[in-house]
């Protein structure tokens, strides 16, 4: 399915995450003031068995009202001021679990699930300056719950689900017809991918029957090398890159949501479980704004959440920093400049809205 790459301020090094999406039918703006202090408690519980069906997802009944500020901080602690609100534009139709790429001047929204629970081949181009959305092509292989990364300037889509789990690697770079350029060593869906600028990395997911633990690296989108192994196989994790490492947050392992935080060293390929989320979480997405790593939305059990957490890689701590405009899961995410775009998703049904999360340096804790 949700993203933005290592340097989210550069439109061509977008991190594209798995494809989970959800949005909300509210227009209030949520104001968040964020710092790395006042971490939440950690949980080591395995969590409850999640539902794989949208019909069983429920909106969190205890969510704070949109627009209510949450402030944390301590003297001398740098802070980032976030605002979240619905964008002025919407998608032509509701979609969840798409892959979203940042492009020059906009977004590319690829694949996903429709409100009728069917996989779409649609490719949409969003012009952020003019707030317009237009059809930009069709996938050769329709997929949802795929993953994307930018490799040598090419927008590549890896795997995904449809009538069967796919191994296709599809080049969806604007300016050329979408095409299948190669295949993963094995089919994968519910996976994530990131880029470090020189190469793309494919992590997590499953092949239709068992979880995938091999970490793949590609420098051209055509050949893949195994560079490491995940300590815990997960589907639907959130992913971010920070400090020369890939971080996986939560996800589903053996049909149960997990609290695990996995760190993969990009130099050695070594992976380890280094900490835990405050509670089991899957179907969330992560993004990086002004150097801060944030985990947003997702599901705990069958409940869709609107919570936003900030992650401190140095201390392996999470800080609850506020709420999205509404409960949200299974959305696609990409970062353009200092704004993260949370596209589509489930709330708990598929939606056609886009949420903008903006960051400004400073702010008064």
List each language-model region with its residue ranges.
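Intrinsic disorder/low-complexity segments
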Residues: 6-11, 31, 49, 360
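Sec-dependent N-terminal signal peptides
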Residues: 17-29
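C-terminal motif of bacterial Sec signal peptides marking the signal peptidase cleavage site
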Residues: 33-35
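Kelch-like beta-propeller repeat domains
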Residues: 3, 37-43, 47, 54-365
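Generic short amphipathic/hydrophobic targeting helices enriched at N-termini
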Residues: 2, 12, 22-25, 76
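N-terminal secretory signal peptides that target proteins for export/translocation
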Residues: 1-17
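Generic hydrophobic alpha-helical membrane-segment signal
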Residues: 6-9, 23, 248
């Amino acid at each position: 399915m949700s993203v933005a790459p290592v340097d989210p301020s550069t439109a061509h090094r977008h991190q594209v995450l798995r494809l989970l999406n959800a949005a909300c039918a509210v227009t209030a703006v949520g104001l968040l003031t964020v710092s790395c202090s006042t971490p939440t408690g950690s949980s080591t519980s395995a969590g409850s068995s999640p539902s794989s069906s949208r019909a069983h997802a429920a909106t969190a009944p205890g969510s704070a009202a949109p627009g209510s500020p949450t402030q944390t901080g301590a003297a001398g602690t740098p802070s980032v001021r976030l605002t979240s609100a619905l964008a002025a534009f919407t998608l032509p139709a509701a979609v969840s679990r798409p892959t979203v790429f940042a492009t020059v001047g906009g977004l590319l929204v690829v694949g996903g699930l429709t409100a009728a629970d069917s996989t779409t081949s649609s490719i949409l181009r969003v012009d952020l300056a003019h707030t317009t959305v237009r059809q930009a092509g069709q996938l050769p292989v329709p997929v949802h719950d795929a993953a994307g990364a930018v490799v040598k300037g090419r927008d590549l889509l890896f795997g995904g689900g449809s009538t069967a789990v796919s191994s296709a690697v599809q080049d969806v770079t604007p300016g050329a017809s979408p095409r299948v350029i190669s295949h993963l060593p094995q089919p994968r869906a519910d996976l994530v991918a990131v880029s470090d600028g020189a190469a793309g990395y494919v992590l997590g997911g499953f092949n239709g029957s068992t979880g995938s633990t091999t970490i793949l690296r590609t420098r051209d989108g055509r050949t893949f090398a195994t560079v490491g192994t995940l300590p815990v196989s997960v589907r639907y994790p959130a992913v971010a890159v920070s400090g020369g490492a890939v971080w996986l947050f939560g996800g589903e392992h053996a049909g149960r949501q997990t609290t695990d935080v996995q760190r993969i060293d990009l130099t050695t390929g070594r992976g380890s479980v280094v900490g835990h989320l405050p509670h089991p979480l899957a179907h969330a997405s992560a993004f990086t704004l002004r150097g801060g790593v944030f985990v947003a939305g997702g599901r705990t059990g069958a409940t869709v959440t609107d919570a936003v957490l900030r992650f401190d890689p140095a201390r392996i701590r999470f800080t609850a920093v506020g709420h999205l405009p509404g409960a949200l899961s299974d959305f696609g995410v990409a970062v353009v400049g200092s704004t993260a775009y949370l596209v589509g998703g489930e709330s708990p049904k598929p939606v056609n809205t886009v949420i903008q999360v903006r960051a400004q340096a400073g702010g008064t804790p």
